[in-house]
A protein has these predicted regions:
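Extended terminal and domain-junction accessory segments
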Residues: 1-191, 196-203, 213, 223-229, ...
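Short strand-edge motifs at loop-to-beta-strand transitions and within beta-strands
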Residues: 206-210, 216-220
Length: 245
């Protein structure tokens, strides 16, 4: 990477394979020159054109938060930890979808960085992304915190209307906000800016990880059912897996 000549004893070597034996049968692997589809059965699509599924069981709005440290002496403050919905991993379980359900999750990235988000035990599809007014939303978000507790940085109680790291969401998780979303956060709708941004070609289809960019809402369609079932064919409460999740 620094432009130095490759060492011929290590990375400067190339391995070459020469296949000279004739085939024992018909080659059934894909031939790109023929232009045929690699997947004979089209992939199930929960979303097309940046539009959420025609029907879904629940919407959630969850935040990505960076907890910052205070400057001490000559050392500048910086990120101490990254939290999902302002909650530590040892916090109580908050996302409890029903098996078979289809949900729309809107991930609100309040940090300065892109974060790859991975969901366990299920795949999902990226719907779209959209920018929002970060400064105005942060003010509304901070204003929703009740105060109390103890700020470990200052040793004093948090005043009301100030962001409380690792407190969890500022509002009741299971009470829908003005956007009709669970998660315990102020609705992001009034702060959205500009048009939606469609997924890149490589982001289409089923994914287990997608990048969530700063200052944007990333919307994903999550279905808690096998990926080969047709869109709209699953029902919340019905287990279509071959095991008990």
């Amino acid at each position: 990477s620094n432009g130095a000549k490759a060492d011929p004893k290590t990375v400067g070597q190339i391995m070459q394979f020469r296949v000279v034996l004739p085939l024992n049968g018909t080659d059934t692997t894909a031939n790109p020159a023929l232009g045929a589809a690699l997947r004979p059965t089209p992939m199930v699509k929960l979303t097309t054109g940046g539009v959420p599924p025609a029907s879904f069981d629940q919407k959630r709005q969850l935040t990505l938060n960076e907890v910052m440290g205070m400057p001490q002496g000559i050392y500048p403050g910086g990120p101490l930890e990254i939290l999902v919905n302002n909650s530590k991993w040892m916090a109580a379980v908050s996302e409890t979808p029903r098996v078979g359900a289809t949900e729309v999750w809107e991930i609100i990235n309040l940090t300065a960085d892109a974060h790859p988000i991975h969901l366990h035990l299920t795949q999902f599809q990226l719907i779209n992304r959209q920018s929002f007014n970060l400064n105005k939303y942060l003010k509304a978000y901070a204003a929703a915190f009740p105060g109390g507790g103890l700020d470990p940085m200052t040793g004093l109680p948090y005043p009301a209307g100030v962001y409380m790291p690792a407190y969890g969401p500022p509002l009741a998780y299971n009470t829908a906000n003005a956007d009709g979303a669970l998660g315990g956060n102020p609705a992001i709708g009034p702060f959205l800016q500009g048009p939606i941004r469609l997924p890149e070609p490589n982001e289409n289809g089923w994914k287990d990880t997608v990048n969530m960019y700063p200052g944007q809402v990333s919307r994903i369609a999550v279905r808690f059912a096998p990926t080969d079932l047709a869109a709209g064919s699953t029902t919340a409460g019905t287990n279509n897996y071959s095991f008990d999740p």
